[in-house]
Regions:
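Active-site proximal loop and beta-alpha junction motif in alpha/beta enzyme cores
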Residues: 2-86, 92-306
């Protein structure tokens, strides 16, 4: 007798999952995110399990109905190990997915949508060109800055000599939804030489458990930076290709030091040392909030049967 069980024709859950590369218009570049377009009815445990199943993706976003009356949607973000409050590339990926599914529509205009996140209700936008999603914009929070109490540890954490650090700006922390520590380098060539000690990242600000990572960067020209982003081990991410929340905070860091471009928009390049280069456009809107813009491309969509 054959006792091998066969898959049931009826399953309790059919979860459609997209893989989307954000902050790029080139397939297999930028930052990949998992997108679950219908997250309603999934428990937090199930969301974490799905994010864990997509273990080569740093974050998975779940699009849900809001419980805040001032929002039209809710976005929840999970790494393979925990829920996080905000994620830039997953937000861009979610907006594009809503456009591809026809849940956001437009011809040659920008559709705005108010979205509930764990840091509050944010205004997002999806710009259409000839009916197709073209650019996503994400309002972040008013920028905050703070000293990095452990700034002297930055070179050792990155595996670089002190001579690699720029004399133009100091090492410091900034926030536009998540805290990050920014380490300015003399030139882009130092980015390729980094050998990060992830276990020591929290030494940069030991009293802040919300420090999301370290962001070494250098100027390519007066309007463009190139950087890398590394997280402490608790996030389950060693290096992130293009980090939208950190790019927004970078804008706040540079604003506080007079380093933003004269026209107010910074091009933040990231992920090139990983072979996944992409970029975010960073500015400050009329309300004083940081804003990032980016593109995205779909890689695949499938059904998770569990």
């Amino acid at each position: 007798m054959n006792t091998t069980s066969k898959p049931s024709a009826q399953r309790n859950h059919h979860v459609e999952v997209w893989r989307v590369n954000a902050f790029t218009d080139v397939p297999f570049k930028g930052n990949p995110a998992g997108v679950v377009a219908d997250g309603d009815g999934l428990s937090e445990e199930a969301m974490l399990a799905i994010a864990g199943e997509l273990n080569d993706i740093s974050e998975t976003v779940f699009i849900c109905q809001p419980d805040d009356p001032g929002a039209e949607l809710r976005l929840r973000y999970f790494t393979t190990t925990m829920e996080v409050d905000l994620c830039g590339h997953a937000t861009v990926s979610a907006l594009f997915t809503l456009g591809w599914l026809g849940r956001l529509r437009g011809d040659n205009e920008t559709r705005t949508v108010r979205v509930q996140t764990n840091v509050g209700v944010l205004e997002l936008g999806l710009q259409f060109a000839a009916g197709e999603p073209a650019w996503a914009s994400m309002q972040q929070l008013p920028p905050q800055t703070a000293p990095a109490p452990g700034a002297e540890h930055a070179p050792a954490i990155l595996g670089l000599p002190e001579s690699a650090l720029s004399t133009r700006f100091d090492t410091g922390c900034a926030y536009a939804g998540l805290w990050a520590c920014f380490v300015p380098l003399e030139d882009v060539s130092w980015l390729r030489r980094i050998r990060v000690d992830s276990d020591r990242i929290e030494e940069l600000w030991p009293d802040n458990p919300e420090l999301s990572g370290i962001y070494p960067f250098a100027f390519v020209d007066e309007t463009t930076t190139q950087g890398r982003f590394f997280s402490p081990p608790k996030y389950g991410i060693v290096e992130d290709p293009v980090t939208g929340t950190a790019c927004g905070a970078l804008g706040g860091y540079l604003l506080s030091r007079g380093g933003m471009p004269g026209d107010g928009e910074l091009v933040a390049r990231q992920g090139f040392e990983m072979g996944r280069g992409g970029l975010a456009r960073v500015s400050r809107n009329a309300n004083g909030n940081m804003q990032i813009r980016g593109q995205a491309v779909p890689i695949f969509r499938g059904e998770l049967l569990a």
